[in-house]
Amino acid sequence: MIYLEMNHVKKNFDDLEVLKDISLTVEEGEVVSIIGPSGSGKSTLLRCATLLETMDCGDLSYLGKKAVTMENGHSVYEKPAVLGKIRENFGLVFQNYNLFPHYNVMRNLCDAPIHVQKRQRDEVEQQAKELLYKMGLTGKEKAYPCQLSGGQCQRVAIARALMLNPKVLFFDEPTSALDPELTGEVLKVIRSLAEMHMTMVIVTHEMAFAREISDRILFMDQGVVVVEGTPKEVFSSENNRMKGFLGKFRDK
């Protein structure tokens, strides 16, 4: 089943064309990684997919339900009530966590399920405790973000996204703000989600991790998808731009 479908997406910031006719389909249980140099449009594509940025052109649907349609060459968004229901299909983990600093861990996890999804507090708190256990964060329920390491904050952010029971989980460079040791903690969690067949779209600079975990990889540059395929196909590509990009990582 197709969980996410984007067709012919274009996005401009003033005179700068950031996305140039990009299409993306993600199926149930698939892990898709998006790689490429800074400024290639990776994060903008993710923000368009999660309705944080508006597309100038293109359409978008989740599980066959249209969020954005094309009319006369322009994107037309559904009404807010429809978009609100569609947002329930996905979760997003940011590179800088975006936890509420004045909420403790438990409230960061439970606030949206209780007040937005109108779920029962007992059920929500039980789910939160189970997720914190899976994240290796038992005992941190009453801690505030300022009392946690970066790796712990990112694991709380992942747990918070999972609290809403999303069909698709998006990651926008989830380890870019972490040192190598803490990066390993977060990648371990994402790896475990992949083993559970969680549908994920991951923007990342972790090349070895992308190669290991992904069913499919997109290499973007200057607003277009230059190479797309399995990890083996992408990392063995003879495309000169792809080879040059990978060469810079191997030289580090």
Question: Which ranges hold each PLM region?
Answer:
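Catalytic Walker B motif of ABC-type/P-loop ATPase nucleotide-binding domains
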Residues: 169-172
